[in-house]
């Protein structure tokens, strides 16, 4: 539904509801100045046909659509909505999704139609403890089914050291990697100064950046977490020594070096697949060999 509407406007200066009269740059009433989200720059006479054509071409010109020099200093309008609902919390079935050729697949089932996905994460699931473990199970099953993918798992908000160790103990697979704790970052909307969010999105960025700069053989660790301004829980060396044997990868702050990923372990109890980079490197080799030998399938 529209949030602001004005009817029966006219570009003619002789009209009772002329553009410049109804939507002036400086409304006479203070209430209008505060509530009117748009204004007109048009104050001249009745536009000619050439003026209309030029305006239409200007709207279609991508250069004309770029923000001008004063765009950053222009007022910003924040409209607060009340009521409504975000709907029910997505559960494991929603994340798993369904394959549908006509209406389009949903959830993880939609990713099964994209061949070159290598990293999968479900950070929003960590905000709902009641269904989080089931969502991780769905992510685990997806990675196993697609063979060449790894899943990034987030610890839940506010978990203690013992709680995150117990949570990690529910899973044992080299295709999953768990990260702890949650991170603090600036609110991009500007509504709040900071947000505390799951680390999975930042970790996926570290994976992708390391892949591009160094390759999948390089451990996605000792890398700066860009955009992170704090951690929900401070992790020191002694706390990390408690979590390492359980395959929990910690995020830590180092004076002069910033916030960094300080761990690259999988959740596998098999020592041969203990590290993320080793597992991903072998997945890369397996996938490359499979693709390069397709010519021999029917030989």
Predicted features and spans:
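A glycine- and small-residue-enriched flexible loop/hinge signal that marks low-structured segments
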Residues: 1-299
């Amino acid at each position: 539904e529209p949030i602001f509407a004005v009817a029966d406007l006219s570009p003619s200066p002789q009209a009772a509801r002329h553009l410049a009269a109804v939507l002036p740059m400086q409304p006479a009433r203070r209430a209008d100045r505060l509530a009117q989200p748009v204004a007109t720059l048009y104050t001249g006479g009745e536009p000619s046909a050439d003026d209309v054509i030029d305006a239409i071409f200007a709207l279609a010109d991508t250069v004309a659509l770029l923000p001008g020099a004063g765009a950053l200093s222009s007022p910003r309008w924040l409209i607060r909505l009340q009521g409504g609902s975000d709907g029910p919390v997505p559960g494991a079935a929603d994340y798993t999704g369904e394959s549908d050729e006509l209406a389009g697949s949903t959830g993880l089932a939609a990713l099964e139609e994209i061949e070159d996905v290598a990293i999968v994460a479900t950070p929003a699931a960590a905000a709902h403890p009641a269904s989080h473990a089931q969502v991780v199970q769905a992510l685990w099953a997806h990675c196993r089914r697609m063979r060449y993918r790894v899943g990034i798992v987030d610890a839940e908000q506010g978990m203690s050291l013992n709680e995150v160790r117990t949570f990690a103990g529910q899973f044992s697979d080299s295709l999953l990697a768990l990260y702890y704790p949650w991170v603090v970052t600036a609110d991009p909307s500007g509504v709040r100064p900071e947000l505390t969010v799951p680390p999975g999105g930042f970790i996926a960025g570290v994976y992708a950046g390391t892949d591009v700069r160094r390759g999948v053989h390089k451990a996605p660790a000792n890398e700066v977490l860009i955009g992170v301004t704090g951690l929900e829980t401070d992790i020191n060396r002694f706390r990390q020594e408690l979590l390492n044997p359980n395959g929990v990868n910690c995020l830590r702050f180092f004076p002069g070096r910033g916030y960094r990923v300080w761990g690259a372990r999988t959740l596998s109890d098999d020592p041969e697949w203990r590290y993320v980079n080793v597992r991903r490197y072998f997945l890369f080799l397996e996938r490359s060999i499979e693709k390069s030998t397709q010519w021999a399938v029917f030989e």
